[in-house]
């Protein structure tokens, strides 16, 4: 029997891993330069956490969650998104005692049972952060600004930030009624999912890809905002305009999670076709209370690593790739091996990537392997070199080689490599 990876998952290795490291390290740097702390939560939680937070009638809960019973009979779900676990951790660990305006970022795998396609897998990976405490539109601005900073730091330019306000529970009531009246006139023409959502969560009709043409003429949420929500949205746009962060107002944007209030946004990249979203987020002021805590304003964002990497490739952005096989030490004989290990240790202390042969191959086999792995230099040590107190440094690209006094080998090699 041949074992294969599960459908909707991927193995990541070789040059591809450098794209992942580039995205993750850039994200960490942006977050930590803004004073955002890292948080790590379990990849599985109680199912009810996501039912309460994401929404019982959402597509995620209805169709996409990986849910199972553990041996104690508890319903467990692999996390489909990262916000609810952070809120749960915040409440459970009494992090509110640290005061308001707390900020946490995360990087990790999420799980949804969807049809696998380019950039959309069943195990996918996200970067994200949550800002807990501020109600001011300054916080909404900061989130969008940091997302824009992160994407530009990666080198991306061909994306647009879509922005909307879906109001608070008070003003959204009138908006729901307006949508009911509008869609009620065309209900027979809608897809089965939209007919179900008409009764359970009518805002989700705006996000339907099948009946998208109806959303173009649907009532706009911004026309039903209360004075407080309208002022919040206006101020957010003023901040974005002042700092020249470009955005597109998109009044069909609602996002796929039920916990959002007021600000919602989505980043779409022009190089990814129909599945163009690479990041999104918004405000979720009612989620803490919904999960059993006090009412705490909060907001955040998440970006799909797979999608962001596709965007990098679509723009042809070159990323830094470190050669982890920079120096290869080829040895002949037991004594030469022991000295090779010592030299490798000296070079690694100087920050070089060094590999030592442990296969007892002939010299030709060792050098062939070094070239195959992409090593730039080979250090050759045999009985003759030991007797002379030297090592040979060979440039595997040019074939040039030089004899080096063993006592100064580490310094010489480190200096030689630094000049390339």
From Swiss-Prot:
The entry's keywords: Aminoacyl-tRNA synthetase, ATP-binding, Cytoplasm, Ligase, Nucleotide-binding, Protein biosynthesis
Q: What is its EC number?
A: 6.1.1.21
**Is Nucleotide-binding one of the keywords?**
yes
A cellular component term, taken from the record's GO annotations: cytoplasm
CDD domains from the entry? HisRS-like_core, HisRS_anticodon
Q: Which Pfam families match?
A: HGTP_anticodon, tRNA-synt_His
Give the primary localization class.
cytoplasm
Concerning Gene3D superfamilies, the annotation shows:
Anticodon-binding domain, Bira Bifunctional Protein, Domain 2
Q: How does it assemble?
A: Homodimer.
Protein name, per record: Histidine--tRNA ligase
């Amino acid at each position: 029997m041949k074992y294969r990876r599960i459908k909707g998952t991927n193995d990541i290795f070789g040059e591809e891993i450098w794209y992942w490291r580039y995205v993750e390290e850039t994200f960490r740097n942006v977050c930590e330069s803004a004073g955002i702390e890292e948080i790590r939560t379990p990849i599985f939680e109680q199912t009810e956490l996501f039912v309460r937070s994401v929404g019982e009638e959402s597509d995620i809960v209805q169709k996409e969650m990986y849910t199972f019973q553990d041996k104690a009979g508890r319903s467990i779900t692999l996390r489909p998104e990262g916000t609810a676990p952070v809120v749960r951790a915040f409440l459970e660990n009494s992090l509110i005692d640290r005061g308001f305006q707390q900020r946490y970022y995360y990087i990790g795998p999420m799980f949804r049972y969807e049809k696998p396609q380019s950039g959309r897998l069943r195990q996918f990976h996200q970067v994200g952060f949550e800002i807990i405490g501020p109600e001011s539109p300054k916080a909404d601005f900061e989130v969008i600004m940091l997302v824009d900073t992160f994407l530009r730091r990666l080198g991306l330019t061909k994306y647009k930030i879509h922005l909307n306000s879906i109001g608070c529970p008070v003003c959204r009531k009138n908006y729901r009624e307006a949508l009911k009246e509008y869609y009620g006139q065309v209900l027979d023409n809608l897809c089965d999912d939209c007919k179900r959502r008409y009764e359970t969560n009518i805002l989700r009709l705006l996000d339907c890809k099948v009946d998208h043409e109806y959303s173009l003429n649907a009532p706009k949420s911004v026309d039903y905002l209360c004075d407080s929500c309208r002022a919040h949205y206006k101020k957010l746009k003023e901040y974005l305009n002042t700092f020249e962060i470009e955005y597109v107002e998109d009044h069909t944007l609602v996002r796929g999670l039920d916990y959002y209030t007021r600000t919602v946004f989505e980043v779409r990249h022009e190089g990814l076709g129909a599945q163009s979203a690479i990041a999104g987020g918004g405000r979720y002021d009612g989620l803490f209370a919904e999960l059993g805590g006090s009412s705490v304003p909060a907001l955040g964002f998440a970006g799909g690593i797979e999608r962001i990497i596709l965007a990098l490739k679509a723009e042809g952005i070159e990323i830094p790739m470190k050669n982890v096989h920079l120096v290869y030490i080829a040895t002949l004989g037991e004594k030469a091996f022991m000295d090779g290990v010592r030299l490798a240790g000296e070079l690694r202390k100087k920050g070089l990537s060094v590999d030592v042969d442990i296969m007892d191959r002939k010299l030709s086999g060792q050098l062939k392997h070094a070239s195959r792995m992409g090593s730039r230099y080979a250090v050759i040590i045999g009985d003759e070199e030991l007797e002379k107190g030297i090592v040979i440094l060979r440039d595997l690209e040019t074939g040039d080689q030089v004899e080096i006094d063993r006592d100064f080998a580490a310094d010489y090699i480190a200096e030689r490599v630094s000049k390339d």
